[in-house]
């Protein structure tokens, strides 16, 4: 059973469409990856996710970036938007998700999630390469990164840093994955390009202070 968000925050859902809401986080399933890393996965945590996807596409100030890659400056293959500690999130549903994550994971994490980064994968050509969130504290400390996905599913891959078996989770339509413990420094994750026809997806990454 999901908990609907305050009706005053949203237009009434069209007939046959699910209201935007959140399912209990107690239903998340934890998997130990080894070396102190773990992931929690909760499919369909955010209900009415397709409505939220449409709102975020229309209202978030998306922008493209270019980054130095060895001797070249290249386009980042996805659109981005970032919300720092003092910036309001672009939709009340994200405020509710943020609060729920803090309530559930705050005691284990020892601090709240502070920032939100949004990535818009427009089609199978958009991607993110293998990496860990190791800019800042994630390189030396255990931490958590919570990712909510809306829109069409894309595969999030995880593998041990240095190589090893790949763990695959298709994420979309309100799915949640939380990467915790040593995951950012002992494992890597990626959203690879795909030649298959896939629809667009937005991921929302909640992080504590000093983790990027």
What are these regions (language model features)?
Residues 1-212:
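Non-heme Fe(II) oxygenase metal-center motifs and adjacent flexible, charged/small-residue loops
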């Amino acid at each position: 059973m999901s908990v609907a968000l305050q009706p005053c925050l949203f237009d009434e859902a069209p007939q046959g469409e699910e209201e935007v809401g959140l399912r209990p986080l107690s239903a998340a399933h934890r998997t130990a990856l080894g070396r102190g890393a773990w992931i929690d996965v909760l499919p369909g945590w955010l209900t009415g996710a397709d409505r939220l996807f449409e709102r975020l596409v229309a209202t978030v100030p998306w922008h493209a970036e270019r980054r130095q890659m060895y001797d070249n400056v290249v386009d980042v293959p996805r659109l981005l938007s970032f919300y720092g500690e003092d910036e309001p999130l672009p939709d009340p549903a994200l405020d509710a998700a943020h609060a729920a994550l803090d309530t559930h994971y705050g005691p284990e994490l020892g601090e709240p999630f502070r920032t939100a980064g949004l990535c818009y994968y427009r089609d199978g050509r958009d991607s993110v390469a293998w990496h860990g969130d190791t800019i800042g504290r994630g390189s030396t400390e255990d931490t958590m990164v919570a990712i909510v996905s809306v829109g069409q599913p894309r595969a999030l891959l995880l593998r041990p840093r240095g190589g090893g078996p790949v763990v695959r989770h298709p994420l979309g339509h309100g799915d949640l994955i939380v990467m915790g413990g040593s995951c950012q420094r002992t494992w890597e994750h990626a959203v690879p390009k795909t030649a298959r026809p896939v629809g667009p997806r937005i991921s929302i990454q909640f992080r504590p202070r000093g983790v990027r």
